[in-house]
Curated annotation (Swiss-Prot):
GO terms for biological process: negative regulation of growth hormone receptor signaling pathway; negative regulation of protein localization to cell surface; negative regulation of receptor signaling pathway via JAK-STAT. This is Leptin receptor gene-related protein. It is a multi-pass membrane protein. The keyword Cytoplasm does not apply. The gene is Leprot. The lineage of its organism: Eukaryota, Metazoa, Chordata, Craniata, Vertebrata.
Length: 131
């Protein structure tokens, strides 16, 4: 039952993050949909971790070059997701209020993604058996 509660909490927080993102795009004062490009970063952020989890067989090692490279790429993706709205606001493509809403949505969504991996990524194999 704890897995179901965690899944409901994660889906609720994901919905809140996407609501912030949509508010940053669809409110009448802002009305520009360029910030939706951060959805691409949401999709590709876990991919380096998936690849490193599949390729790395030695789970007892304290450090793995593949795992460290995956952390590096994931960090670059997350920083890019936070940087894109700031750059768009700086060049006056979007307004600063929309930038703030998108940044709040980014924080909530990335914490949700991290929470998902902390809750459901504990298994030895890669099957997400707690679902």
């Amino acid at each position: 039952m704890a897995g179901v509660k965690a899944l409901v909490a994660l889906s609720f927080s994901g919905a809140i993050g996407l609501t912030f993102l949509m508010l940053g795009c669809a409110l009448e004062d802002y009305g520009v949909y360029w910030p939706l490009f951060v959805l691409i970063f949401y999709v590709i952020s876990p991919i380096p971790y998936f690849i490193a989890k599949r390729v790395t067989y030695d789970s007892d090692a304290t450090s793995s070059a593949c795992r460290e490279l995956a952390y590096f790429f994931t960090t670059g993706i997350v920083v890019s997701a936070f940087g894109l709205p700031v750059v768009l606001a700086r060049v006056d493509v979007i307004k600063w209020g929309a930038c703030g809403l998108v940044l709040a949505g980014n924080a909530v969504i990335f914490l949700t993604i991290q929470g998902f991996f902390l809750v459901f990524g504990r298994g030895d194999d890669f099957s997400w058996e707690q679902w």
